Protein backbone atom coordinates (compact mmCIF):
# COMPACT_ATOMS: atom_id res chain seq x y z
CA UNK A 1 0.00 0.00 0.00
CA UNK A 2 1.94 3.01 -1.24
CA UNK A 3 0.24 6.22 -1.22
CA UNK A 4 1.36 9.37 -2.83
CA UNK A 5 3.70 11.65 -0.83
CA UNK A 6 1.88 14.52 0.86
CA UNK A 7 -1.38 12.55 1.12
CA UNK A 8 -1.94 12.00 4.83
CA UNK A 9 -5.39 10.45 4.28
CA UNK A 10 -4.08 8.12 1.59
CA UNK A 11 -1.15 7.19 3.81
CA UNK A 12 -3.46 6.37 6.72
CA UNK A 13 -5.68 4.23 4.49
CA UNK A 14 -2.67 2.49 3.00
CA UNK A 15 -1.21 1.78 6.43
CA UNK A 16 -4.54 0.35 7.62
CA UNK A 17 -4.74 -1.90 4.55
CA UNK A 18 -1.15 -3.02 5.14
CA UNK A 19 -1.98 -3.81 8.76
CA UNK A 20 -4.80 -6.08 7.59
Swiss-Prot record:
Q: What does this protein do?
A: Hemocyanins are copper-containing oxygen carriers occurring freely dissolved in the hemolymph of many mollusks and arthropods.
Q: Where is this region: Disordered?
A: 1-20
Q: Which family does it belong to?
A: Belongs to the tyrosinase family. Hemocyanin subfamily.
Coarsely, its chief localization is: secreted
What tissues has this protein been observed in? Hemolymph.
Record keywords: Copper, Oxygen transport, Secreted, Transport
Q: Which GO terms describe its molecular function?
A: oxygen carrier activity
Q: Which domain of life is it from?
A: Eukaryota
Q: List the GO terms this entry assigns under cellular component, sorted alphabetically.
A: extracellular region
Question: Where does this polypeptide localize?
Answer: Secreted, Extracellular space
**What species was this sequence derived from?**
Panulirus japonicus
Q: What is this protein called?
A: Hemocyanin subunit Ia
Respond yes or no to whether keyword Transport is given for this record. yes
Q: How does it assemble?
A: Composed of 3 major subunits (IB, II and III) and 1 minor subunit (IA) which form homohexamers and heterohexamers. May also form larger structures.
Amino acid sequence: ADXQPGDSTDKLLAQKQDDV
